[in-house]
Amino acid sequence: MTLVDNRNTSEPYVNLAIEEFLIRHGDCSHQDFLLLYINQPCVVLGKNQSIYKEVNFEFLRNKQLQLCRRISGGGTVYQDKGNLSFSFISQFSESKINNYRLFNQPVVDALRKIGVDAVMDERNNIICKGKKISGNAQFTNRKNIISHGTLLFDADLNLLRNCLKENDFKVESKAVSSVRSSVMNMKDATDKISHTEGLKEYLKRDLKADSILQFTEEEWNAIVKSAADKFKSFEWIYGRSPLTTITKPDIEIEVEEGIIKDIRHKTQDARQLIGTKYEFNEIKKALENSKACDLLKSIF
């Protein structure tokens, strides 16, 4: 197993770009790669999810967290310094598709050695005492395949629940929806490791990551550029959201690819927003010099 040196970055967009770079350019013909990283507080959506359905609007409005989207499917996850993310990148094989046990069993075994009663459930999550400690997803380009997941060690579970809680108004979309689960932190199940960095170092050893991949400056610059140009862009984070209908008191809004496609309100003033990005600051800016500025609270 070859450990990927991510230069100890906690920038979620950079770590997401590293994963895509390895999928597209990694030589997995003679080695498998392991990427371990700890992100700054963020919410990460699956590739095919609607951001408006998955994330609580209070958080969307106040921008309290970085919002991200990964290249794999699956559900939305919250990450912070109390969460360790792991990614296995290997050469593609049909037998690896949805074979989460192949990738996750070594992680489960490692956790059990430190006293965490970890098992895999029928949804391919890793659970402990009936509660979820790890969600997982996969992506392949038929050259390489990535199977990656989260490990809740000492995350802010109140923040997790608040930013992912359902809104108190109707949000409809045919996008893939997250399956909400009870969660727990592993720190409550082991006294052998005291912090997330300790878990990271332990997994390096137990998973036998005995060689290191270091990116050249040219490769690193390409990764950082991809993080800025793609993974941090409105088009990727918001724009990949499928058609979503938001129904609030006295107003109905249709949003597709992050853009207001239609809006129904008792006044005609709201229709000026058709074609506007459905994002709080964009709508606020569009309404600043309008008689309909009081619409802002109704719309977002």
Predicted stretch roles:
Residues 1-98:
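N-terminal lobe of the biotin/lipoate ligase/transferase fold
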Residues 6-9, 92-100, 148-150, 185-193:
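Flexible, glycine/proline-enriched loop segments at strand-loop-helix junctions
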Residues 21, 107, 114-116, 134, ...:
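Long, positively charged amphipathic alpha-helical accessory segments at protein N-termini or as interdomain linkers
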Residues 39-41, 120-130:
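Short, glycine/charge-rich beta-strand/loop segments that flank catalytic centers
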Residues 83-124:
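Contiguous, small/hydrophobic- and glycine-enriched helical/loop subdomains that border
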Residues 128-137, 253:
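A short beta-strand motif that forms the metal-chelation/ATP-contact edge
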Residues 249-274:
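Catalytic-core signal marking the mid-to-C-terminal active-site face
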